[in-house]
């Protein structure tokens, strides 16, 4: 009886099997897409209280502290980093340096000096620095109070290898 029933509903059975195959295929594609998406920085809002600040130590001496808000890849970048740094008076996080990322610094408190591509500029709240890939740059606190700034670094999709 069962084989005859199967023969009578062959079209329905084929349709159900196709639907199951499509469903499994769709589910596996969605799973793969979710795994790929998880590698990228997700939309989010963070408060300073959510960020763990770490001490900046260079040549064995504490220079200030840094906290990273976001780090990872986005749809248009790789090595994307957003953070905040606080430098003690007279300190710099490290000497003038270069890196492959573009970078923006936004000063929110204190006084200092930025060296960008060979030019030194006095800075304070509201000062902004942009530097392209591999351009020499650095920042130093020249004031009597903590120098606070935010930074954003990234490598654009066009420069991906």
How should these model regions be labeled?
Residues 15-23:
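Bacterial N-terminal signal peptides
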Residues 24-79, 160-161:
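A short, N-terminal "cap"/entry segment at the start of jelly-roll beta-barrel domains
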Residues 77, 133-158:
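Ligand-binding loop in jelly-roll beta-barrel domains
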Residues 100-112, 117:
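Glycine- and acidic-residue-biased ligand/ion/polar-headgroup-sensing regions
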């Amino acid at each position: 009886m069962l084989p005859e029933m199967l023969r009578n509903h062959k079209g329905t059975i084929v349709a159900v099997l196709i639907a199951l195959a499509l469903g499994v295929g769709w589910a596996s594609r969605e799973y793969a897409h979710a795994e790929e998406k998880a590698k990228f920085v997700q939309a989010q809002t963070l408060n300073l209280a959510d960020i763990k600040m770490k001490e900046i130590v260079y040549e064995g001496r504490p220079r200030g502290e840094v906290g990273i808000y976001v780090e990872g890849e986005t749809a248009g970048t790789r090595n994307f980093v957003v953070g905040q740094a606080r430098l003690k008076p007279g300190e710099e996080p490290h000497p003038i340096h270069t890196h492959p990322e573009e970078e923006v610094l936004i000063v929110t408190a204190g006084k200092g000096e930025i060296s960008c591509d060979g030019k030194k500029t006095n800075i304070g709240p509201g000062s902004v620095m942009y530097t392209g890939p591999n351009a020499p740059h650095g920042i130093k606190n020249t004031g009597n109070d903590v120098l606070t700034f935010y930074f954003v670094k990234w490598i654009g999709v066009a420069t991906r290898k």
